[in-house]
Amino acid sequence: MAKIIAFDEKARRGLEGGMNQLADAVKVTLGPKGRNVVLEKKWGAPTITNDGVSIAKEIELEDPYEKIGAELVKEVAKKTDDVAGDGTTTATVLAQALVKEGLRNVAAGANPMALKRGIEKAVEAVSGALLEQAKDVETKEQIASTASISAADTQIGELIAEAMDKVGKEGVITVEEFQTFGLELELTEGMGFDKGYISAYFATDMERMEASLDDPYILIANSKIGNVKDLLPLLEKVMQSGKPLLIIAEDVEGEALSTLVVNKIRGTFKSVAVKAPGFGDRRKAMLGDIAILTGGEVISEEVGLKLENAGLDLLGRARKVVITKDETTIVDGAGDTDQVNGRVAQIRAEIENSDSDYDREKLQERLANVAGGVAVIKAGAATEVELKERKERKHRIEDAVRNAKAAVEEGIVAGGGVALLQASQVFEKLELTGDEATGANAVKLALEAPLKQIPSTAVSRAAWSWRRCATSPWATA
């Protein structure tokens, strides 16, 4: 396929045009009086939403340069959604304003690398100022309030606060679609770890880029799996059972990985491979935790177990496993309760006997994983109309969970763009010169953009609001 190549101003303007088209469609939803956007669907009724990342995902542009520009802003919205669960529209507005000011200065002859250094120094200073402003979120009521705002639903906020209260602030909370009305909270045995699928081809939900396995077998191996001949006997047994397979191993590569991916794409066999969490002895211990929670065995030659000889009796089981690119959550493992309790007691004893702060911290993480369990929020619907939109409701709850966890970790600040504007006062302390100072000034101007956008969507007096918020002491979080 022939490539279209552009340089300098033509390339920059093409990228900016795509960014502006996407950002202009998204930013009208900002604020308490933000507008809704109607999204056409290939089939069925159109979707009405004010969720920034949902709008961004739907935008596809014809011009190749504009398409690249739009994709860059999509990535901004998506990363914000993944980390914080909210604030995607604000992030889009900031990105648009920063790019606009940056390109204006580049066109005027500024050095792009010096601008970049100035932007990075300014962003670091602003991040520090925002953290200083932040109020801690500690009580159940504060968590419920934060999650309620994100989900635009008080009941969802209270349920998330209840879930965090039961499994701890570092605990695993997962959301499942439920075939009935309303919301329900269930606490089950299970765990999560920070390793995702090895290949994106394993994803079963391409929109969310996650894989979901119902009632799977779980192979736990403390070694690399590369030779498909070693894996084939076990694969045939699992395929005969009609169940999906989750493979947790040091690595899955070569023929073995290719075979799993090809069978998944063809629809012959549903499986997901993930790398084992941790390293060295810690990995061995965490694999042992997973084995006990799921009722399986760790396949390792150290204990005389070889992959080619493994049967279904050595595999773990769970009611459900959800895997994203970054993490794996095992829900309701089939492990024996007495063995799980014994493992908890063993880890607690190791914590008491440990002299190393680092080791103690890692043991505490393992203890939380094994003993804390998994909180499952079952998302039904309040009405028959909502029942048709259950998937969107599930995504909204997942975003609210991430939002609540981010608030607990780093605190909350004044909303409405006020905190960003007040954080810009930190620029008075930055001692930058030349194009680095110009880059920092671009950040300062971008920080004003969200607060200027909110009144414009509400058809209000933007200039008056901006001046008052910049100077009002009550606006400080």
Swiss-Prot record:
Subcellular location: Cytoplasm
GO molecular function: ATP binding; ATP-dependent protein folding chaperone; isomerase activity
Keyword set includes Cell membrane: no
Amino acids binding ATP: 29-32, 86-90, 416
Single biological process term from Gene Ontology: protein refolding
EC numbers: 5.6.1.7
Main location: cytoplasm
Reaction catalysis annotation: ATP + H2O + a folded polypeptide = ADP + phosphate + an unfolded polypeptide
Summary of the function given for this chain in its UniProt record: Together with its co-chaperonin GroES, plays an essential role in assisting protein folding. The GroEL-GroES system forms a nano-cage that allows encapsulation of the non-native substrate proteins and provides a physical environment optimized to promote and accelerate protein folding.
PANTHER family: 60 KDA HEAT SHOCK PROTEIN, MITOCHONDRIAL
Assembly behavior: Forms a cylinder of 14 subunits composed of two heptameric rings stacked back-to-back. Interacts with the co-chaperonin GroES.
Family designation: Belongs to the chaperonin (HSP60) family.
NCBIfam families: GroEL, PRK00013.1, PRK12849.1, PRK12850.1, PRK12851.1
Name assigned to this protein: Chaperonin GroEL 2
Organism the protein comes from: Streptomyces lividans
